[in-house]
């Protein structure tokens, strides 16, 4: 793709998200979602092949359906309240439909089926945008309508997402699918706390984006897309392999790494609101995520595969720019927990 055209498309994606996050008019929010959706499709098809075409089509159909539900919710709210403003409380029916639309855009269960398939069908760089930047706009809408969200519906989808995210990743060997199921589980944690403390949900989103970005950049350095290719990494880049071990354990939520911080805070906040059973179920189901990440780190870093000269040639083609950007990302992805006492300021 022409670099100038790619830059324009990328700017359009950012502009669409910025419109959704800053507007106070429902129609402008819908327009922002449409701009974002239409601009991201060429990015998903950057490497043109049948798999990327299929992934882009699945993404388009899912997002178009979600946009239709969003417009339906806007029209219902207009019928009852006569207001286009996002600052006014939503009608209960409109709130439920809008929650379902945002769940579809985020990939929450039971609307999660498109996430692994689309992520697997695109390049690593496109998958990074899909699993990080594309979560910002729907989360900002959920943040704005959080006072009127149906708590039971949101908690049901959250618990289902955590279960599906852990269960679906158990038998995967494709790294992009593993990260997609991990994304579904993380979205479940974020939406679970959205009604109780929306600010904490945004903090959780920021840490999730940081961890996922670090993981994708590491995989792009090595051009690894399967667990088998990742298992040969120790012979070429032992330091980077050690870093991948800690980042993946952080994504799984193992203390004292950064990924444990949001889970700890969410469980603490939910117990403060006299909710005991839900956080217990969520914590137990997260062990599934931790299990497949520990299995991945074992095969990557704790076992030595036979080394051949052909395997060692690949280091010459590493992207030096990506490697230079990894140091601050790795530090932040593993050492946020010591700063967590400062998070008391959120209360």
Curated annotation (Swiss-Prot):
UniProt keyword Translocase present: yes
Subcellular location: Mitochondrion inner membrane
Any GO BP: mitochondrial respiratory chain complex I assembly
EC number of the protein: 7.1.1.2
Entries under InterPro entries matching the protein: Complex_I_Subunit_2 (IPR050175), NADH_DH_su2_C (IPR010933), NADH_UbQ_OxRdtase_chain2 (IPR003917), ND/Mrp_TM (IPR001750)
Family stated for the protein in its record: Belongs to the complex I subunit 2 family.
Name of this protein: NADH-ubiquinone oxidoreductase chain 2
């Amino acid at each position: 793709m022409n670099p100038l055209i790619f830059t324009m498309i990328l700017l359009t994606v950012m502009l669409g998200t910025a419109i959704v996050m800053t507007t106070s008019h429902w129609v402008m929010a819908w327009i922002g979602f449409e701009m974002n959706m239409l601009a991201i499709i060429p990015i998903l098809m950057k490497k043109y092949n049948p798999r990327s075409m299929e992934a882009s089509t699945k993404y388009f159909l899912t997002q178009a359906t979600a946009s239709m539900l969003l417009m339906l919710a806007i029209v219902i709210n207009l019928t009852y309240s006569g207001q286009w403003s996002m600052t006014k409380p939503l009608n209960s029916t409109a709130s439920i439909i809008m929650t379902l639309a945002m769940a579809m855009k985020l990939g929450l269960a039971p609307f999660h089926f498109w996430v692994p398939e689309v992520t697997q069908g695109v390049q690593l760089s496109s998958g990074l945008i899909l699993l990080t930047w594309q979560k910002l706009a729907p989360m900002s809408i959920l943040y704005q309508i959080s006072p009127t969200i149906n708590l039971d519906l949101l908690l049901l989808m959250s618990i289902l997402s955590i279960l599906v995210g852990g269960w679906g990743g158990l038998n995967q060997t494709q790294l992009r699918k593993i990260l997609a199921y991990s994304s579904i589980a993380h979205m479940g944690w974020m939406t679970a706390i959205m009604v109780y403390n929306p600010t904490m949900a945004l903090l959780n989103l920021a840490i999730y984006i940081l961890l996922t970005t670090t993981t994708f950049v590491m995989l792009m350095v090595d051009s690894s897309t399967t667990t088998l290719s990742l298992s040969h990494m120790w012979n070429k880049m032992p330091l980077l392999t050690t870093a991948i071990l800690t980042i993946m354990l952080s994504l799984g939520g193992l203390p004292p790494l950064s990924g444990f911080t949001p889970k700890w805070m969410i469980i603490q906040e939910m117990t403060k609101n006299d909710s005991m059973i839900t956080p217990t179920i969520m914590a137990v189901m997260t062990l599934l995520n931790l299990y497949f990440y520990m299995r991945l780190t074992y095969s990557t870093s704790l076992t030595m595969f036979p080394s051949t000269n052909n395997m060692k040639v690949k280091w010459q083609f590493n992207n030096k720019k990506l490697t230079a950007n990894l140091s601050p990302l790795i530090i932040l992805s593993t050492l946020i927990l010591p700063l967590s006492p400062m998070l008391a300021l959120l209360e």
